[in-house]
């Protein structure tokens, strides 16, 4: 099974990029198994390295469904990162962030 995570942006960087002081991101990973958690942790590490002032939250799909974080925070789906296309997907996500002015 190929694991993936979905990346969302929320907060001022996505509501009003000119007033933003940080970039709030949410990583939603598929489950609580080791491989899913490791992929989410690696994504968080790489995103934190490449995005200045990033604040990154991680939730499993079940946790996100329980808390309704995406809806409550009015989070914007930015893309997905698949473990077998990690670098390509990370580059695509970076492009999306640049286009939105969140970088």
Predicted regions and their residues:
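Catalytic core of pol beta-like nucleotidyltransferases
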Residues: 1-10, 14-20, 29-103
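Short beta-strand->loop micro-motif that forms the acidic, two-metal-ion catalytic signature
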Residues: 25-27
């Amino acid at each position: 099974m190929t694991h993936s995570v979905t990346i969302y942006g929320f907060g001022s960087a996505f509501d009003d990029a000119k007033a933003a002081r940080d970039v709030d991101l949410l990583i939603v990973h598929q489950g609580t198994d080791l491989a899913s958690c490791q992929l989410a942790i690696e994504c968080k590490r790489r995103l934190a390295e490449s995005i200045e002032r990033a604040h990154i939250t991680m939730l499993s799909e079940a946790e996100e469904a329980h808390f309704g974080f995406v809806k409550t925070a009015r989070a914007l789906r930015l893309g997905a990162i698949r473990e077998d296309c990690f670098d390509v997907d990370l580059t695509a996500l970076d492009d999306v962030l640049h286009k939105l002015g969140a970088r």
